Design a protein with these regions (language model features):
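A positively charged, amphipathic N-terminal helix/segment that binds anionic biomolecules
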Residues: 1, 73
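N-terminal helix-turn-helix DNA-binding core of bacterial DNA-binding proteins
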Residues: 2-40, 44
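A generic structural micro-feature
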Residues: 6, 65-69
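Residue-level signal for threonine
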Residues: 8, 75-76
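Short, charged/polar surface micro-motifs in flexible loops or helix N-caps
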Residues: 20-24, 48-49, 78-80
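Beta-hairpin "wing" of winged helix-turn-helix
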Residues: 49-66, 74
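Amphipathic alpha-helical dimerization/coiled-coil segments
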Residues: 78-111
Length: 111
């Protein structure tokens, strides 16, 4: 079996939450309704298996906002394929976590 066959419902919800654009952890929790104890371990697993990739925003952006730098997550090509399969398996996923419009891509390089 391939990577996408092992998606849990929570992982599928997380993939759906970040499908439209880069998201950081709190955004993912807000969109998905899942707690941090579910989201962050799942994001680590999804990144380890190549379904998502992460990037840190530029330090200057965070400094101007007077907060720590955010780590943003985005689906990989394999992650998009896994989400497509998950949408077939979990038919209500689109209703539970509607796709949000693509937002402006954050500045993710450190500088």
């Amino acid at each position: 079996m391939d990577k996408k066959s092992y998606l849990s419902h929570s992982e599928a919800v997380i993939l759906q939450a970040i499908a439209s654009s880069y998201k950081y952890g709190f955004d993912i929790m807000d969109i998905s309704g899942l707690p941090s104890g579910t989201v962050y371990p799942a994001l680590r697993r999804l990144e380890e298996t190549g379904l998502v990739e992460s990037r840190w925003e530029k330090e200057g952006v965070a400094q101007r906002a007077q907060r720590p730098a955010r780590k943003y997550y985005e689906l990989t090509r394999v992650g998009k394929e896994a989400l497509a399969e998950a949408l077939k398996r979990y038919r209500l996923l689109d209703r539970l976590v509607p796709r949000v419009p693509r937002s402006v891509k954050p500045s993710t390089e450190r500088g």
